Structures are given as structure tokens and as C-alpha cells.
Amino acid sequence: MSESNVTETNEQRGFRKTREGLVVSDKMDKTVVVAVEDRVKHALYGKVIRRTNKLKAHDEQNAAGVGDRVLLMETRPLSATKRWRVVEILEKAK
């Protein structure tokens, strides 16, 4: 038996993006809306601009609440607008 006949069982997944953001809504079942802030420097004037993007993320246990800081990871499309999932809750709201 040669090594070439053995199939590769542990295939590598592609690189998945991670984002950190603040939960702004948890009213949907197993879904949270997370505001992810991006700071961009203006090309001409050099001023730092804050850009916010709202992402819908899958939260299987409904553990995240409004005001929590969460870590998101990119995943396959789970619905029409949901392409992220909550990996962990970094900080609970006070």
C-alpha cells in the first residue's frame, strides 16, 4: 500500500475573518446585531474617521445581551443577511 492511496482526512479550512464589536440589539431569537467600528484615516486631510458597520451574528445559546463586547467569526451564510457567528463574549455589560 502506498501513501498516495490514503485520503487526506484533516483538510484545512480557508482563512476566516474575525471582528470585535458591541451588541446593539438582541431582540431576535438566536441572532444579535453587532456594531463593528472601523477607524480610517482620511487620505488627504489625515483626520481619523470612525465608520460603524452593523452585522447580524448567530448566537446559539442567546447568551449575548445589549452592551456586551463580543468576538465574531465569519461563517457560511445562515440566512439572507447573517454571515457571522458569536465565538465568545469578551465583556458583559454592566
UniProtKB/Swiss-Prot annotation:
Q: Mind telling me which GO cellular component terms the entry cites?
A: cytosolic small ribosomal subunit
> A GO molecular-function term, please?
structural constituent of ribosome
The reply on keyword rRNA-binding is: yes
What are the entry keywords? Ribonucleoprotein, Ribosomal protein, RNA-binding, rRNA-binding
SUPFAM superfamilies in the record, alphabetically? Nucleic acid-binding proteins (SSF50249)
Gene Ontology biological-process entries = translation
Source organism, top-level taxon:
Bacteria
* Recorded family membership: Belongs to the universal ribosomal protein uS17 family.
Say what the protein does. One of the primary rRNA binding proteins, it binds specifically to the 5'-end of 16S ribosomal RNA.
What NCBIfam families does the entry give? PRK05610.1, uS17_bact
State the protein's name: Small ribosomal subunit protein uS17
- Give the originating organism: Streptomyces avermitilis (strain ATCC 31267 / DSM 46492 / JCM 5070 / NBRC 14893 / NCIMB 12804 / NRRL 8165 / MA-4680)
Q: Which gene encodes it?
A: rpsQ
